[in-house]
Amino acid sequence: MMPAKLQLDVLRTLQSSARHGTQTLKNSTFLERFHNNRIVFCLPFFLALFFVPVQKVLQHLCLRFTQVAPYFKIQLFDLPSRHAENLAPLLASCRIQYTNCFSSSSNGQVPSIISLYLRVDLSPFYAKIFQISYRVPMIWLDVFQVFFVFLVISQHSLHS
């Protein structure tokens, strides 16, 4: 499991980028769907991440790749726009997968996945989406939410 210190360090990095950023990331829609007794749960990565500058996030992730490599799989790829004549191409997307966060289910070894998706659409509207999605056994859903809220509260208490 990822050390708590590294989790806090990654969150502090994103929060620091948010405080010094000029570009904003708009809120994404709430999505939820079930699949084979697992849940794919997408929601905005709230708090500071609503105002994270896109380039700084990518830069920090690249700089910290060697540190988080044992815990994250980082993949950068391009997604061209379907309507290039109307919208600027979708230049970059960043996907971070954090595996083996939770214990395996009773059915056997089922690797859990936590992914951060960063999609930057350089259209006139600058639609930027930053969302966290995770697929875990159903019993871990509330555990993860409680842990995430506790992590956020801890961050606020450290800064105050």
UniProtKB/Swiss-Prot annotation:
Q: Which GO terms describe its cellular component?
A: membrane
Q: Does the keyword Transmembrane helix apply?
A: yes
Q: Where in or outside the cell?
A: Membrane
- Give the keywords, sorted: Membrane, Transmembrane, Transmembrane helix
Membrane topology qualifier:
Multi-pass membrane protein
Q: Which residues cross the membrane?
A: 39-59, 136-156
Task: Report further notes.
Answer: Completely overlaps YIL177C.
Q: Identify its protein family.
A: Belongs to the UPF0479 family.
Protein name, per record: Putative UPF0479 protein YIL177W-A
